[in-house]
Amino acid sequence: MYMKFIAAAIVSILVIAGSAQQGHAASAREIDQGVDATLERFYGKVKGARELAAKARGVLVFPTVVKGGIGVGAEYGEGALRVGGRTAGYYNTVSGSIGFQLGIESRSILILFMTDKAFENFRKVNGWNIGVDGSVAILNLGAGASIDVNNVTDPVIGFILDPKGLMYNLTLEGSKISRIEK
């Protein structure tokens, strides 16, 4: 019985993620516009964020990541990798979960690669699994927060924003990020 539930959950996740990929596929131009808007929102919410992004080897931005489910959930979003302020590729993020959940939510995700090694490790794999291929330290900051770029020591850091601002106590573990063609 338990194995049937797991199998059904996996199939549901794949169906939801697959339909999200087809139904929400944005053009390169739309993704770039969303990335620009998300970065500006991030810079406006966190003092020092612009300097931190400038120091990063690469900044991966997913402007809209939609998560939804009834018992079984899936999450999908498309974004762009920025290197030196320019788009260097397009990516998607997909994850699934099992447990009590009901509804749909949207958020933005920013991942900053702060070291050459972390950035190279991300770019060399086809499908980067957070928690397996690399860890992302989510920085929990309060409203009106600031970042001292000299005190950031993690090789990969992440920020999660909702329409109101930075979100707290969240994880990206289990998310898979893959390069896509646009």
Where do the protein language model's features map onto the residues?
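Sec/Tat signal peptide C-region and signal peptidase I cleavage site
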Residues: S19-A25
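Positively charged n-region of N-terminal signal peptides that target proteins for export
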Residues: M1-F5
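Bacterial N-terminal signal peptides
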Residues: A7-G18
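Small-residue-enriched, tightly packed secondary-structure blocks
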Residues: A25-K182
